Amino acid sequence: MFVLGIESTAHTFGVGIVRDSPPYILANERDTFIPKEGGMKPGDLLKHHAEVSATILRRALEKAKISINDINYIAVALGPGIGPALRVGATLARAIALKYNKKLVPVNHGIGHIEIGYLTTEARDPLILYLSGGNTIITTFYKGRFRVFGETLDIALGNMMDVFVREVSLAPPYIINGIHVIDICAEKGNKLLKLPYVVKGQDMSFSGLLTAALRVVGKEKLEDICYSVREIAFDMLLEATERALALTSKKELMIVGGVAASVSLRKKLEELGKEWNVQIKIVPPEFAGDNGAMIAYAGMLAASKGVFIDVDKSYIRPRWRVDEVDIPWRN
């Protein structure tokens, strides 16, 4: 079985190709939109994805050394995400499905992150931290779905950091040589400022931290502000995670999503693992950010259980939560 996956939920347009035997991942091509200034504008994302989609598709097929006729199923991320960006991927997936008579597999973007985590870390029954620009979720699989134990009450951890570095003119670009610019800035700081720390049960709030940090710009060293924002945000996350570990008694902690690439977070999680006698499983950097391979792999799992969608019903779902998705392949 060969499955082609299309990812276009935010700033990255990606196409991945997988098969149902090792090595599972045959191709993982992508192109990421980097704004010259400001944040991501939906219209700019649409234009970028539309311009690069054909090239990325061709590169993926060439990398996998197969033709479109060899593909069994087309998997596509229908949400959550930014509407115009989602539509580019959905439109391409529908066109391929219709032209080549292929079945269409609907994939939740977050489930893609989680499933590629299972594959690459070999986790079996973990508590999961899903950390990205748009999501901050503590979850685990239970009775047919991924159940959310904790999440952000406002903006996501990754988004908070992106907005902060953009507002203080450190970005774009947000990532330099694989390192987020807040980490680069924070490594030069050492003073922990008094900024909001908000954890409610296993939920977190990052908006107050962002607002307060921006208010002290010009009054404190920027390096110390970066250091404080990073340390406080990560410590909030770790407190909520410890509570979830105590509740679930899990012996594995799997971290997926773009923020999983943070070296400083990795160090904190390794210490947490030692304290709680928990194995830390972190998705490799290649699969931490948005990518088509994770959509293809999750799509292959779904297709194996007959999860398909008619082309005329393949609507995008910008607010599609991971706990709304039935997971028959894990029952």
From Swiss-Prot:
Residues that coordinate or bind substrate: Y130, L131, S132, G133, G134, D162, D183, S262
Catalysis performed (reactions): L-threonylcarbamoyladenylate + adenosine(37) in tRNA = N(6)-L-threonylcarbamoyladenosine(37) in tRNA + AMP + H(+)
EC number: 2.3.1.234
Gene3D superfamilies per the UniProt record, alphabetical: 3.30.420.40
Molecular-function GO term, any one: iron ion binding
CC cofactor note: Binds 1 Fe(2+) ion per subunit.
Domain of life of the native organism: Archaea
Sequence positions that bind Fe cation: H109, H113, Y130, D290
GO biological process, one term: tRNA threonylcarbamoyladenosine modification
Disulphide connectivity of cysteines: none
One cellular-component annotation, GO: cytoplasm
Keyword field: Acyltransferase, Cytoplasm, Iron, Metal-binding, Transferase, tRNA processing
Cofactor(s) the protein needs: Fe(2+)
InterPro entries: ATPase_NBD, Gcp-like_dom, KAE1/TsaD, Kae1_archaea_euk
Positions in coiled-coil regions: none
Transmembrane segments: none
Enzyme class: transferase
UniProt cross-references to Pfam families, sorted A to Z: TsaD
Compartment annotation: Cytoplasm
Homology family: Belongs to the KAE1 / TsaD family.
Protein function: Required for the formation of a threonylcarbamoyl group on adenosine at position 37 (t(6)A37) in tRNAs that read codons beginning with adenine. Is probably involved in the transfer of the threonylcarbamoyl moiety of threonylcarbamoyl-AMP (TC-AMP) to the N6 group of A37.
PANTHER family xrefs: TRNA N6-ADENOSINE THREONYLCARBAMOYLTRANSFERASE (PTHR11735:SF14)
Entry protein name: tRNA N6-adenosine threonylcarbamoyltransferase
Top-level taxonomy: Archaea, Thermoproteota, Thermoprotei, Sulfolobales, Sulfolobaceae
Gene this protein is translated from: kae1
